[in-house]
Amino acid sequence: MINPAKRTSTIELSQIRKMFEVTNPTAINLGIGEPDFDVPENIKLAMEQSIKNNETHYTPNKGYIELREAITQKFKKDNNINTNPENIIVTAGASEALYMCAQAFIDKNDEVILPDPSFLSYEACIKLADGKVVGVNCEMENEFKLKASDVQEKINKNTKAIILNSPSNPTGAVMDKEDIKAIADLSIDHDFLIISDEIYEKIIYDKKHYSPAAYSDNVITINGFSKTYAMTGLRIGYLNAKEEYLEELLKIHQYNIACANSTAQRGAYEALTGPQDTVNKMVNEFKKRRDLIVSRLNEMGYKTVNAQGAFYVFPKIENPEKFVKKSAENGVITVPGAAFGQNGKNHVRMSYANSYENIVKAMDILEKGVN
């Protein structure tokens, strides 16, 4: 037998995906992080027209210039980030952008600071680059928000980067402006990289989103179209970085996939430049669902923070593994919080990217059959 590379032994296949493969397909799925809405019609039409125009060949490595220009305008308008199309790479989803960052900048034993809990792909990407994860606890008492003062305590001569994710998967936490700016200042003072995953930027309720790249140029900003425009299967995202970073990132991108999907790029352009009413409707619906699930869980005695963004809640639950197992047996899929870090071990992640009616049914099942 041919032995696999040692680096793959440091990670495992996603426990979330494994669980979905063995659960009852008729169960109510509160586990998956995917909008239950369809791609808006104007985006579908743009992609259909692209195929009719035979735009099915390679695009420039960085992506179509029209799309990169639209992304540049989006950064200026929404994020107060002044950039240009040459500093943008269109990627195969935000996931590729994250992997590119790790491969381009993380060396053996470099330390990367991560919020704990955080999206499980972050740790995997760091380990595949032979880096070392340094966790910073995000406490429930502070609504799971990452604090700059806690980050500062973890910085040393080996610190290479920090990954930020606001709004957060799995907690729905939205970082305060003061902490975003303070961490940006720390990146300048201590010369480390900020990788800012802003994929949930538009799915935000009672707060405002802030980008660290508005305060420091030691930042690679990652975003995409999967969550905001329900384009998960089309695998289209992007990143922005200063010129000296971009050349290294482009090496990984160029030899990995050459370019992002041409048809999806045309859809992405329409997403940014077309009407945004479907996004607003989706976010309003998510807010209603959040209010429902938070209220029901708290009524059941499961302490739950009122998430400010994304579409997840992270209730505190005694014996989460037993809860997840019993929930699945009764027809509701949830995810153990330990999948997202040591600090998530007393929690369960639930996604409200499911219909209002299904969430009501799921809460009734949990109340009767699990609680």
What is the predicted role of each segment?
Residues 2-4, 21-23, 28, 32-49, ...:
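PLP-dependent class I/II
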Residues 58-92:
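Conserved N-terminal alpha-helix of the aminotransferase class I/II PLP-enzyme fold
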Residues 12-16, 64, 94-95, 144:
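Conserved donor sugar-nucleotide recognition element shared by glycan-biosynthetic enzymes
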Residues 1-12, 63-66:
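Conserved PLP-binding active-site segment in aminotransferase class I/II-type PLP enzymes
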Residues 6-24:
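Short, Lys/Arg-rich amphipathic segments at extreme N-termini
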Residues 49-55:
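N-terminal alpha-helical segment of soluble enzymes
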Residues 9-12, 33, 37, 57:
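Short, N-terminal intrinsically disordered low-complexity segments that are rich in Pro/Gly
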